[in-house]
Amino acid sequence: RKYYNILMKHRMWLEMKRVLDVIVAGIMLAVLIIPMGIIALAIRLDSPGPVFFRQARVTQYGRIFRIYKFRTMVDNASKLGAAVTVDNDSRITKVGAFLRKYRMDEFPQLFNILAGDMTLVGTRPEVPKYVKKYTKEMYATLLLPAGLTSRTSIAYKDEDKLLGEAVDEKSTDNIY
């Protein structure tokens, strides 16, 4: 409640941020539509399966939404190995490695921004199983929409390396 009251004092800024998100995401999609088409074709030619990876994530007020990314791993990768990917994971496709290196796999999230599920800069769009482990203070992050980028994403840009150093799933969970 305390954090909610703080945010409500800045309600006008949050509404202006939403307008800016829509304008910027729209412009970025207009610029990126042809490269995104080329990426989609490259994914289809590189490995069988869908072009997009879809996954349930948590956004503002704990609402579940479906995040979109370009698929960077073989189809049904979650059935072939750990939920967490690390460097040199054999499930990552050739095109996928390139997309991940330059963060181009996240371009489809611009559609999530237009839909109102995400914002350009916000909190990390987390998987529901990790949100269940949030502390009381961490739940305050759910007062804001999930972001395409965030302070956490920048601070842990080498997330694969960090997670690769975790010994088991329990220690991986503790990172979050």
Regions found by a protein language model. Name each.
Residues R1-A30, K136-A140, D160, G164-Y176:
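N-terminal hydrophobic signal-anchor/signal peptide
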Residues Y102-Q109:
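Short acidic-aromatic low-complexity motifs
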Residues A42, A83, M138-L142:
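Short, P/G- and charge-enriched loop/turn segments at secondary-structure junctions
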Residues F53-R91, T152-Y176:
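Short, glycine-rich, amphipathic interfacial segments at transmembrane boundaries or analogous
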Residues Y4, K9-D75:
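A hydrophobic, helix-centered structural microdomain
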Residues Y4-E15, D87-R91, E106, G122, ...:
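Juxtamembrane loop-helix boundary motifs flanking transmembrane segments in multi-pass membrane proteins
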